[in-house]
Swiss-Prot record:
Glycans are attached at residues 23, 37, 53, 68, 78, 180, 300, 498. The record marks 344-345 as: Cleavage. Residues 1-16 form the signal peptide. It comes from the Viruses. Belongs to the influenza viruses hemagglutinin family. GO terms for molecular function: host cell surface receptor binding. Residues 17-529 are extracellular. Residues 551-565 are cytoplasmic. This is Hemagglutinin. The keyword Protein biosynthesis does not apply. A lipid is attached at residues 554, 561, 564 (S-palmitoyl cysteine). One of its GO terms (biological process) is viral budding from plasma membrane. Palmitoylated. In natural infection, inactive HA is matured into HA1 and HA2 outside the cell by one or more trypsin-like, arginine-specific endoprotease secreted by the bronchial epithelial cells. One identified protease that may be involved in this process is secreted in lungs by club cells.
């Protein structure tokens, strides 16, 4: 019985040696913010590392419509840009229009004399970048020919008509004299002249319209010359016509002279388009145009430009994210995430940052947990938190500044004759996209590595700052925790947090308590051994007492034991 009492007292003494439960000591642990479910990001050294927070850098969807702000967006409806420029009757509404972006619809069609443009893409690009269909008529003198030719394939209302910006010249009577007309450019801007040549469907039509069996058109300036002859022959019927018109264009610089020489088949200019330099463009899209604001437009619709990358469409207009092949790239905007462990030690110990993060700390990234005579508590360290946030906040903006294009990426078209150029251009574009995709992944991985390193460094700075303050008044318990060997109430804990702790005030008390506690302190491993040994001895003594009682009862005859074989 005495032995049992001694063991019970010993067990109580072991429990009483928990230094964190006394009034003369305190425990302070440093920790960092954690979340239950973090986000996986890629760094230089790890393919997947979990962080508390991350921002998606790739815009993968459009808003489904084209915003008419911040740019002047002109809906071409049933007209292509070239038809509007030539003056197709059903496109007269676009005369003298201006735009930042001209939208061509898949439903657009031509409704005049059938034509082709040998260098269609270049002309379309020149007119689109000019951003206007401003046209000025000039007084060309065409002597000895009939002007204003018309066709039943080109109706303006119910009457036969023709392209409003072109003048179809045919014979006058039985003659078609050689034409030689000049027009100087006395302006201080470039002039764009549109002209053409008619290809009759037969020799009979050729002589009927132009007398000569074969015509010729030569258009020249001081810098260039083009000579075109008609290709007479039947072609597939389009709007009742098997003939064709080929459209050409000439740019006349200030001080230069336009010269037109022809003996037949000439479709003459009526004036010029004023060329302007700018960043206007044209885009094919069937997305609806609506009232909204966006600085980036794609054929799929407008997209936000608050991300540095996008994989919506390679064709863009405006201030747009860089196109890459990846569907997702995440930029770490938080620290390394170590989800909090819920299991506590035998004495309810509080854990520090080495073991795990703290999910309950919502007002900061770094902080303190403490246990003292007044209980337990937690508080964030705002200074170290702000230091980390300041370094991370500018990352997204810096990445956007490095990658957002301040120009438009126009559509590129090539005729079948230029197939090899088209293949080369496609190869170059694909190579650029591959390079940017690789660079984007590398850039994000580098930034993520830097973010994780700097947040870890801030945690270590806070730990070292606390250790230097406490000095010999506390012992580093490992795992980011300190055992403080003096009475440290909440005000004392607050002074450690804000950096005003004076270790000299508590030095004598801490030194005295350290020696007293060290003299009787048993480490947690020995406490566990004592508990197990005392439990085993108690069980053994109970068994001995029970066996002795049985033997005593048998001797007195109070218990009979019969053994049958």
């Amino acid at each position: 019985m005495k032995t049992t009492i001694i063991l019970i007292l010993l067990t109580h003494w072991v429990y009483s040696q928990n230094p964190t439960s006394g009034n003369n000591t305190a425990t302070l642990c440093l920790g960092h913010h954690a979340v239950a479910n973090g986000t996986l990001v890629k760094t230089i050294t790890d393919d997947q590392i979990e962080v508390t927070n991350a921002t998606e850098l790739v815009q993968s969807i459009s808003i489904g419509k084209i915003c008419n702000n911040s740019y002047r967006v002109l809906d071409g409806r049933n007209c292509t840009l070239i038809d509007a420029m030539l003056g197709d009757p059903h496109c007269d509404v676009f005369q003298y229009e201006n735009w930042d972006l001209f939208i061509e619809r898949s439903s657009a069609f031509s409704n005049c004399y059938p034509y082709d443009i040998p260098d269609y893409a270049s002309l379309r690009s020149i007119v689109a970048s000019s951003g206007t269909l401003e046209f000025t008529a000039e007084g060309f003198t065409w002597t000895g020919v009939t002007q204003n030719g018309r066709s039943g394939a080109c109706k303006r209302g119910s009457a036969d008509s023709f392209f409003s910006r072109l003048n179809w010249l045919t014979k006058s009577g039985n003659s078609y004299p050689i034409l030689n007309v000049t027009m100087p450019n006395n302006k201080n801007f470039d002039k764009l002249y549109i002209w053409g040549i008619h290809h009759p469907s037969s020799n009979k039509e050729q002589t009927k319209l132009y007398i000569q069996e074969s015509g010729r058109v030569t258009v020249s300036t001081e810098r260039s010359q083009q000579t075109v002859i008609p290709n007479i022959g039947s072609r597939p019927w389009v709007r009742g016509q098997s003939g064709r018109i080929s459209i050409y264009w000439t740019i006349v610089k200030p001080g230069d002279i336009l010269t037109i020489n022809s003996n037949g088949n000439l479709v003459a200019p009526r004036g010029y388009f004023k060329l302007r330099t700018g960043k206007s463009s044209v885009m094919r899209s069937d997305a609806p145009i609506d009232t909204c604001v966006s600085e980036c437009i794609t054929p799929n619709g407008s997209i936000p430009n608050d991300k540095p990358f996008q994989n919506v469409n390679k064709v863009t207009y405006g201030k747009c994210p860089k196109y890459i092949r990846q569907n997702t790239l995440k930029l770490a905007t938080g620290m390394r995430n170590v989800p909090e462990k819920q299991i506590r030690g035998i004495f309810g110990a509080i854990a520090g940052f080495i073991e795990n993060g703290w999910e309950g700390m919502v007002d900061g990234w770094y902080g303190f947990r403490y246990q003292n005579s007044e209980g337990t508590g937690q508080a964030a360290d705002l200074k170290s938190t702000q230091a980390a946030i300041d370094q991370i906040n500018g990352k997204l903006n810096r990445v956007i500044e490095r990658t957002n294009e301040k120009f438009h990426q126009i559509e590129k078209e090539f005729s079948e004759v230029e197939g090899r150029i088209q293949d080369l251009e496609k190869y170059v574009e694909d190579t650029k996209i591959d390079l940017w995709s690789y660079n984007a992944e590398l850039l994000v991985a580098l930034e993520n590595q830097h973010t994780i390193d700097l947040t870890d460094a801030e945690m270590n700075k806070l730990f070292e700052k606390t250790r230097r303050q406490l000095r010999e008044n506390a012992e580093d318990m490992g795992g980011g925790c300190f055992k403080i060997y003096h009475k440290c109430d909440n005000a004392c804990i607050g002074s450690i947090r804000n950096g005003t702790y004076d270790h000299y005030i508590y030095r004598d008390e801490a030194l005295n308590n350290r020696f007293q506690i060290k003299g009787v302190e048993l480490k947690s491993g020995y406490k566990d051994w004592i508990l197990w040994i005392s439990f085993a001895i108690s069980c053994f003594l109970i068994c001995v007492v029970l066996l002795g009682f049985i033997m005593w009862a048998c001797q007195k005859g109070n218990i009979r034991c019969n053994i049958c074989i």
